[in-house]
Design a protein with these regions (language model features):
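Active-site-proximal helices and loops of the catalytic beta/alpha 8
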Residues: 2, 21-24, 47, 77-90, ...
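Substrate-binding/active-site clefts of carbohydrate-active enzymes
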Residues: 2-21, 29-170, 185-207, 211-214, ...
Length: 317
């Protein structure tokens, strides 16, 4: 599904049932869609460590549901959102699994809570080497400090198609593909390899056309356009010079995300900014891009501010 205009409110710390109660005000604030947290189970509870929700231990549709809510909660949220014209997107993780922990190869090995059929199949897992982010082959073939899946495998593709079709059955309108840049594109050729048909088979296998935006952050124009044109999906990416030089109609832009705010060190580069500064820059993004994502900082009501409402309504398209 292609949307020309979309103002997405990202509420990763909110339980689904709590979002239901906020829907009327979300609509009043000028948002058109909601992005929820990851709803797959993880290798351990993550009340404290936010990043643990991305260390999932299942990509099966039957297992959807975690601390943020159940399948029934998600179905209720979708139904209530649709009644007032809002869309619901879910953050979905299927490029990697939670690891065994520790250091060395354990960091790149699936956790023992991962289904043994998946865990014990050597054809499902990428090389146990850490990614060199300056090397495209390494990005698509090695591990991002977690146990990383080979999505050129047809069996895995079928499992992921079923996962997303389960979300579609529950009423979801789109998904954010976490760590999408780890997946090679259809016509991205590497020596002595068959091309990866993931995106083609994935989209063909879905029950209906939905919004697909893949996380492709800190990348150059060439890679962003590769996903826009070859994979034929929208790209979720941070504001950058390169983002201004690609097709803006196939971009979901953001100034701040959970990564830039919650990570330590240089990755958490918006942590030092005030909410006023973040909202001001969100306004610049809305002025320049028809599709944007507003991340609501944990334990705040930033999204409820009057200046956010004014920005959304001023740059409505």
């Amino acid at each position: 599904m292609f949307k020309y205009y979309d103002r997405v409110l990202h509420l990763p710390e909110d339980k689904l049932i709590d979002i239901v109660n906020k829907l009327p005000q979300i609509k009043e604030q000028g948002f058109t869609s909601i992005l929820t947290s990851v709803l797959q189970p993880s290798k351990e509870e993550w009340n404290v460590a936010w990043h643990m929700r991305y260390q999932v231990n299942s990509i099966y549709g039957k297992d959807i549901g975690n601390l943020m809510g159940s399948k029934d909660d998600l179905k209720l949220l979708c139904n209530k959102a649709h009644e007032i014209g809002l869309s619901v997107y879910v953050d979905v993780v299927f490029t990697h699994f939670g690891n065994k922990g520790g250091i060395g190869l354990n960091e790149l090995t699936p956790h023992e809570s991962v289904d043994e059929v998946l865990r014990n199949n050597p054809y499902y897992w990428k090389n146990k080497n850490r990614i060199n982010y300056n090397d495209r082959y390494s990005i698509t073939h090695d591990c991002n400090n977690l146990a990383t899946l080979r999505l050129d495998n047809f069996d895995l593709q079928d499992i992921i198609i079923d996962l997303v079709n389960t979300y579609i059955d529950l009423g979801v309108d789109g998904i954010r593909i976490d760590s999408c840049k780890l997946i090679s594109c259809p016509h991205e050729y590497f020596q002595n390899e068959y091309r990866n048909m993931f995106f083609e088979r994935f989209k063909q296998g879905l029950k209906k056309d939905i919004v697909l935006f893949g996380e492709v952050i800190n990348e150059n124009k060439e890679i962003i356009e590769l996903y826009q044109n070859d994979a034929d999906i929208d790209v979720l990416s941070n504001i950058s010079y390169d983002l201004y030089n690609v097709d803006k109609n196939k971009v979901y832009s953001f100034y701040e995300s959970h990564d830039t705010f919650l990570n330590e060190g240089c990755m958490g580069y918006t942590k030092r900014l005030t909410t006023d500064e973040v909202i001001k820059n969100y306004g610049y993004a809305c002025k320049d891009f028809p599709k944007t994502v507003f991340y609501n900082r944990a334990k705040t009501d930033m999204w409820k501010r009057e200046d956010v409402r004014l920005i959304n309504n001023t740059y409505k398209r």
